[in-house]
Amino acid sequence: HQELLIDILKAEWGFDGYVVSDWGAALETEANANGGLDLEMPGPGNVWGASLLSAIKDGKVDEELIDDKVKRILTVAEFSKKFERHGFNPEEAIDQPTHRTLLRKAAADGMVLLKNDGLLPLQSNIKKLAIIGPNAKHAQIIGGGSASLKPHYEVHPEEALRSRLDPEIDITYAKGCHTHKYLPRVNESLMDGEQGFLVEYFDGHNFGENLILSEHLIGNKFWVFEGFAKEIISKQARPNISVRFSCAYTPNISGHHEFEIFGIGQCRLLVDGQEVIDNWTQTDPGEAFFTFSSASKKGMVDLQQGRSYNIEMEYHFEGSFPAVYLGCQAPDAMDLFQEAVTAAKDADQVILIVGTNSDWETEGNDRVEFSLPADQNKLIEAVLHANQNTVVIVNAGSPIEMPWIDDANAVMQTWFAGQEFGNALVDVLTGEVNPSGRLPTSFPKKIEDTPAYQFYPGTNQQMNYDEKLLVGYRWYDRSSVPALFPFGHGLSYTQFQYSNLEVQVIKNNQVTCKFIVKNTGLVMGAEVSQCYVAFEHSTNAEPIKTLQGFAKEILNPQEEKQIEITLAARNFSYWDISTKSWEIRQGSYELLIGSSASNIHLRATIMLEQVQGVLEPLV
């Protein structure tokens, strides 16, 4: 995009680094070269290399553009002292106590108490606690796709609650339901011999002939970005590579075992030589592996406890990069749902931890609904009916529908809180940390109550963002649609009172807002005061109000402080398309001080004169 990447980013803004593509996103040589792209990733590229050289020779790409790209890449390499290092340094990971403390604090500070009718913080008289939910023992601490990293350790809610609460409390655990989008990995502890699968790479289509090499791999998701076939499969050097995964598997429970396979290319699954799944003869488009994968196919096999079975998956790479998936779900030893309901009935208090995982919230595909995956809503409703002393913990990275919200007495959104998630959660549940997180987005009551709903998914995978300026809380204001929980919402274990708003307009249209916030409760807490600006003559295509400033202040019980939020001229401006500048319109502006987009406590009005073409962008 020449205007954005060359004219604005590089020329107007003076950016002297280089522009890199998303992985596999560069599809055209000339358009990318002339549009400002400097580095194609991953390498070796498809649109650079020989294709770029041909475009230069044909006069379709100016050689001066290539010189600029090379200069930018070398400049960054020099700045990062790349030329002073020889070879690759070994990867390092630093795990220090100060890092752990910071991670724990950040996780706790980000948790948002959505609703609390007296259940939190937890009381000290609990005798029997039920920890329920698919995210209790194995929470989702990080997003899927490229956001997935390998932490030094992980602290999950169930283990943290058991280790931190009074040992006299009788604690039970029940999963409640499965939530996987794709079946989980084969249990390595039930494989005979070395850990994981024996993976054999063959040159050609015939399995068993022309073996290149073999290795053992653990897991169920095998792709080039995590080492699988990285040095083996090359369409240039070896256009026909086949891979066989095999292991001896001894189930620890009898019954129907469900298997699942898919990948970029063709794959099939055999158990004791009998084909169970054919995702080879005919494949359909899927959404995994950045939508390059075939659609999932599943098969059921009746396996007997204690007997050894030979599992084989055959795979032929055909597509963008090598990737294949194998999952297996053994039968449950008991009714997970009924186990959870029984545990809830027998407990004084329930901590119910639900949510999503890296299959549901990841890059490469959209969420098409706001419901919690699988049977979690059903589980929540049943547990709430069994025990009103239930705290619902939502371990998800984005908004979800909550059809059970009226029946819940306490709900907290924890997001994907990192490796210290469990400890941070217990800190907040017990009151060691008073929750102070605020919602960075509006939570709708249902998916239809979202700005983009009427435009999604568009036509032929092309969607216009026709909500334009009315995104998030701006759309809810203008449409008069109430959100389930508004932007900026978040409760505390204490209460705050606002008073005495004073507004002053000083030079260059700078505005100061001063007001008093008092902690009227019994415990220390932090309040996030938000300042919104509303122009009296805004059109229907514009937001009614916009957040322009905020301040977070920690207050002791009964303490009050004067809070000051300063707004610059830029905070009252709009972008004029005709003059291509930030301008202020003459008229009345209302300043609204509140604790969320829907909870406004103080108001004041000021008058500003028109200012044209003199405003600098915020830095």
Segments from the language model and where they lie:
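N-terminal active-site wall of soluble small-molecule enzyme domains
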Residues: 2-3
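C-terminal non-catalytic regions of proteins with extracellular/luminal or membrane-system context
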Residues: 6-7, 12-14, 20-29, 47-49, ...
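Structural preference for beta-strand elements that scaffold enzyme active sites
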Residues: 16-18, 38-39
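Short coil/turn segments at secondary-structure boundaries
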Residues: 65-69, 84-91, 122-124, 442
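Helix-enriched interaction subdomains in cytosolic or periplasmic regions
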Residues: 64, 78-109, 314, 319
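Long, well-ordered, tryptophan-enriched scaffold segments
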Residues: 36, 49-84
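Mobile "lid/hinge" segments at catalytic clefts and subdomain interfaces of large enzymes
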Residues: 27, 33-41
